């Protein structure tokens, strides 16, 4: 299971986007989820908790950000500027 991918989660029928961490790429062995679903952990600011959401793969987009950077920014409620990473 790939659990180190930072993603943008798009909420259907809105312009809301969240940053989350893929915690489970496949839910096939869990019969109550559709096959295209993935598990994404969405941390809350100040690390008081977070939500694990099960969402269709089509609603997530991987981004070039480390888990450490995503968690740090979440902890600080995205108040600090992040360094832009350019593709080579």
Q: Where are the regions that the model predicts?
A:
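Terminal membrane-proximal soluble interaction domains of membrane-associated proteins
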Residues: 2-88
């Amino acid at each position: 299971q790939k659990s180190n991918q930072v993603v943008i989660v798009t909420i259907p029928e809105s312009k809301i986007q969240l940053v989350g961490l893929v915690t489970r790429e496949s839910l096939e062995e869990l019969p109550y989820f559709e096959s295209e679903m993935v598990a994404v952990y969405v941390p809350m600011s100040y690390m008081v908790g977070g939500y694990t959401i099960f969402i269709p793969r089509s609603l997530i987009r991987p981004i070039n950000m480390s888990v450490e950077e995503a968690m740090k920014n979440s902890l600080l409620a995205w108040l600090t500027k992040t360094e832009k990473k350019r593709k080579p």
